[in-house]
């Protein structure tokens, strides 16, 4: 037994002697994790530390391996390391600055990771010490601001932004991240704007800058005055707003391109041939294979810009060559982390006005068109939670746009016509529309097409009621503008009317299932009131008198659906159930639709009998309608052109808190600090002796 122990001892000694030597930086980290001040024995300790290549994994792992008590014992050394990192940011040698930035990232992440399981110490105290926190963070933010605004290294700017993203997203709920109080006090808003307004910086760092801004805007936005919200709402510099728009356009365009590539690859493959052979039984499965990860972070940035800054609305309509049709000039690919599809922008800014001029042969586009295409992809499939959130946010953004007077002006402008190829969900009963046959029309037509497309493709068991309500509200707000400004839009209104009637039919045929989960009468009332808008005010905004005739024809043709709806709501409004009041509102709203049906149906039957015709053509019905308008009596209904304006704080706060939490987690997961190798940095900073 003693011999075995001896052998074991010898073996241990032998294996220990073969153990690789620790790199010097790791030995220095180990000294920091002792209770003694490492600079006592080595006065140049901190100076030397920042010349060493950072070992992020070791530093973070070491912090996570200690329990709360052990960490508190070395608190002074951690504070000292944090302060020396901040001091190193002011050094002339860029290598020191880079190492200090990376060390700060490791420190912040390591201490926060520790805090998840041990809440017995405060993070600010652990990193900086309560007494020095204010000055430390002031110095840190000032250094980061200087580095971001300087004309120096793009690699340093990239690391500064990554450190800030690390700082912001280190907790899932950013509003619980107390360190951000110092980021509010020591604002870097102007530095972010400078990046966005300066084309070279925007090309390299625009995406990170926009995501950072979107997250900072959401810090305790409902509890206190957030300076980033205040400042973003008053930005009026054209170059800055356009820069932000370009970054968002690029990111959404990249998503659209990836989706289109996947779609084409899928259609040309074996599975497509198999689908054609056996019919459409695989359509749903095939469609799900086309899923590309959504980009909620950039969508949130677009929402905040549209919602907070009225000047940004002009950026939506800024024309530029369509990104998919333009070849970007050759340029080195910036060092960005490998992230999932749809989460990173293209590598170069292909729409700088300096680099590209508009060509008459090239299809022009703008941010709104890119966004509508993005929405048409995301809103196809709402079964997945991320896509459901993205679809909801798309509709919220469209709601804000539909309420804005200036946005409506360019949406309805006859002189701003575009061909917008929206993505349509594969369905058995319809063929894929040929993109080339699409006419150039005002942009509001594409918005209405998108709403109609959503209405007809989501009548399913898992009914997305919230999205339907928002969709119908967008249509209503657009109609209110058309009525108010007497805009006669040349649109195929019949498609909208047909979609709305089919939606009513769906609600009625699934009454029992839907009523168990939803108040279907709110949606039914909104649909009926859309028809009331057309009936009451259609003569002021429908393109031609014949369009108004077609409205009546459609109501008369589908009278059975309206009769069934009336029977259903009458039944529920006369019972003493929970739906009594909601159903009675629909009953009252149907008064004019029922008046039209009851007025014209006998006249049509009489016309058919007199002329011995068993089935009247559309033109014959329209002839009867035109001849009998004079004797029709309708009731004037109030408030049809009124609506409640969008309000985030009261109705959407829970949604945005959850969305920002999801974005924060995703950004943190995809943050990479190893994108810059030490060799690449040494090459860039070749001035170092």
Swiss-Prot record:
A GO CC term attached to the entry: cytosol
Coiled coil residues, start to end: none
SMART domains documented for this protein: DUF1741
A single BP term in Gene Ontology: regulation of Golgi organization
Bilayer-crossing regions: 520-538
Compartments, record wording: Golgi apparatus membrane; Cytoplasm
Pfam family membership, one: ARMH3_C
InterPro entries: ARM-type_fold, ARMD3-like, ARMH3_C
Alphabetic keyword roster: Cytoplasm, Golgi apparatus, Membrane, Transmembrane, Transmembrane helix
Membrane topology per record: Single-pass type I membrane protein
Family: Belongs to the ARMH3 family.
Function: Involved in GBF1 recruitment, Golgi maintenance and protein secretion.
Subunit structure: Interacts with PI4KB. Interacts with GBF1.
Record's protein name: Armadillo-like helical domain-containing protein 3
Organism classification: Eukaryota, Metazoa, Chordata, Craniata, Vertebrata
Name of the coding gene: Armh3
């Amino acid at each position: 037994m003693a011999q075995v122990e001896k052998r074991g001892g010898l073996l241990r000694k032998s294996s220990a002697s073969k153990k690789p030597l620790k790199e010097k930086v790791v030995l220095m980290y180990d000294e920091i994790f002792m209770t003694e001040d490492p600079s006592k024995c080595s006065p140049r300790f901190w100076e030397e530390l920042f010349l060493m290549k950072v070992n992020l994994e070791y530093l973070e792992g070491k912090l996570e391996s200690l329990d709360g008590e052990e960490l508190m014992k070395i608190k002074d050394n951690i504070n000292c390391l944090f302060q020396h990192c901040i001091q190193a940011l002011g050094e002339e040698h860029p290598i020191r600055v880079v190492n200090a930035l990376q060390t700060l990232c490791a420190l912040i992440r390591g201490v926060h990771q520790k805090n998840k399981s041990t809440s017995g110490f405060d993070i600010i105290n652990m990193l900086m010490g309560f007494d020095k926190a204010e000055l430390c963070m002031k110095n840190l933010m000032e250094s980061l601001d200087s580095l971001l605004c300087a004309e120096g290294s793009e690699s340093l700017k990239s690391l500064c932004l990554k450190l800030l993203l690390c700082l912001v997203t280190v907790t899932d709920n950013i509003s619980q991240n107390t360190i951000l109080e110092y980021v509010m006090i020591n604002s870097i808003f102007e530095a972010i704007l400078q990046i966005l307004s300066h084309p070279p910086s925007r090309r390299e760092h625009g995406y990170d800058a926009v995501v950072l801004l979107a997250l900072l805007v959401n810090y305790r936005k409902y509890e206190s005055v957030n300076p980033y919200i205040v400042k973003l709402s008053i930005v009026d510099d054209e170059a800055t707003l356009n820069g932000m728009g370009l970054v968002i356009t690029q990111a959404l365009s990249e998503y659209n391109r990836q989706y289109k590539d996947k779609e084409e690859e899928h259609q040309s493959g074996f599975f497509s041939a198999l689908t054609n052979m056996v019919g459409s039984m695989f359509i749903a499965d095939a469609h799900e294979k086309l899923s590309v990860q959504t980009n909620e972070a950039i969508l949130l940035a677009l929402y905040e810009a549209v919602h907070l800054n009225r000047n940004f609305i002009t950026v939506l309509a800024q024309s530029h060559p369509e990104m998919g049709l333009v070849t970007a000039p050759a340029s080195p690919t910036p060092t960005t982390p490998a992230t999932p599809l749809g989460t990173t922008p293209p590598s170069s800014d292909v729409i700088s006005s300096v680099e590209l001029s508009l060509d008459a042969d090239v299809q022009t586009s703008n941010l709104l068109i890119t966004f509508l295409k993005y929405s048409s992809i995301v809103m196809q499939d709402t079964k997945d939670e991320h896509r459901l959130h993205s679809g909801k946010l798309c509709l919220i953004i469209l709601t804000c746009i539909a309420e804005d007077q200036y946005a409506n002006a360019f949406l309805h402008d006859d002189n701003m016509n575009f061909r917008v190829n929206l993505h349509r969900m594969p369905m058995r009963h319809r063929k894929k529309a040929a993109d080339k046959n699409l006419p150039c029309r005002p942009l509001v037509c594409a918005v209405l097409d998108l709403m109609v497309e959503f209405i007809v493709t989501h009548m399913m068991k898992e009914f997305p009621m919230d999205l339907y309500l928002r969709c119908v509200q967008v249509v209503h707000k657009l109609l209110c503008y058309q009525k108010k400004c007497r805009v006669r839009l040349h649109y195929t209104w019949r498609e909208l009317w047909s979609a709305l009637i089919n939606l009513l039919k769906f609600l009625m045929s699934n009454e029992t299932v839907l009523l168990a989960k939803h108040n279907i009468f709110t949606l039914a009332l909104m649909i009926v009131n859309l028809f009331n808008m057309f009936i009451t005010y259609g003569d002021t905004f429908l393109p031609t008198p014949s369009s108004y005739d077609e409205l009546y024809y459609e109501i008369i043709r589908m009278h059975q659906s309206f009769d069934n709806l009336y029977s259903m709501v009458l039944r529920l409004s006369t019972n003493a159930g929970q739906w009594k009041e909601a159903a009675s509102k629909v009953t009252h709203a149907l008064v004019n639709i029922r008046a039209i049906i009851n007025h014209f149906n006998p006249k049509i039957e009489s016309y058919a009998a007199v002329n011995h015709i068993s089935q009247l053509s559309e033109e014959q019905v329209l002839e009867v309608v035109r001849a009998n308008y004079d004797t029709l009596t309708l009731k004037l209904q109030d408030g049809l052109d009124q609506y409640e304006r969008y309000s985030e704080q009261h109705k959407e706060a829970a949604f945005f808190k959850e969305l920002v939490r999801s974005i924060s987690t995703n950004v943190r997961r995809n943050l990479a600090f190893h994108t810059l190798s030490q060799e690449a940095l040494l090459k860039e900073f070749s001035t170092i002796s």
